[in-house]
């Protein structure tokens, strides 16, 4: 029997609370096929019309995830909130499945370390990350701030007065600000 071919433009989002549902909706708006999973039937029903596929499932049940073909998805986001055990076990199962890219939401730095150890490729700490971002915006001229790695960030800012109406070369921004 030939293996069914799927688009790589698919993702499974596990946990449909505020973070997971926002992320899933954004993926759908970017034409990504999204399988939204949660153990809370009310949340699943709330998003049934907006996501490509939804199901009520205990994400720590490996066989249930297999029946939903989660192992065939190239990308997964573990957006589970306060249940650390479910977050860790789910991430581990996805890693065992061989999911190519696993993002996981962590509630603390220690939780983040554990998620990385059990197979998460990318870990986000939403409240921590957003707090840093807003602090940079509050401090000054920045309109937006996104940190990529420890030493690299992308910043949208107002142009300094001395740069307005000049070319980049004339303004000497590179030498003055080290950019």
Language-model segments: residues:
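Cytosolic regulatory regions of ion transport systems
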Residues: 1-179
């Amino acid at each position: 029997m030939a293996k069914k071919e799927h688009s790589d433009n698919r993702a499974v989002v596990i946990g449909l609370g505020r973070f997971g549902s926002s992320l899933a909706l954004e993926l759908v708006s970017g034409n990504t096929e999204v399988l939204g999973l949660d153990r809370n039937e009310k949340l699943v029903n709330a998003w049934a019309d907006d996501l490509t596929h939804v199901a009520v499932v205990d994400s720590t049940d490996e066989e249930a995830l297999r029946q939903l073909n989660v192992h065939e998805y190239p990308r997964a986001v573990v957006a589970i909130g306060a249940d650390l055990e479910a977050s860790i076990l789910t991430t581990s199962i996805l890693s065992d499945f061989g999911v190519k890219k696993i993002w996981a939401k962590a509630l603390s730095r220690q939780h983040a370390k554990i998620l990385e150890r059990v197979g998460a490729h990318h870990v986000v700490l939403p409240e921590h990350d957003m707090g840093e971002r807003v602090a940079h915006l509050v401090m000054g001229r920045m309109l937006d701030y996104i940190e990529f790695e420890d030493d690299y960030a992308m910043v949208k800012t107002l142009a300094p007065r001395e740069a307005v109406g000049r070319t980049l070369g004339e303004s000497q921004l590179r030498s003055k600000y080290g950019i």
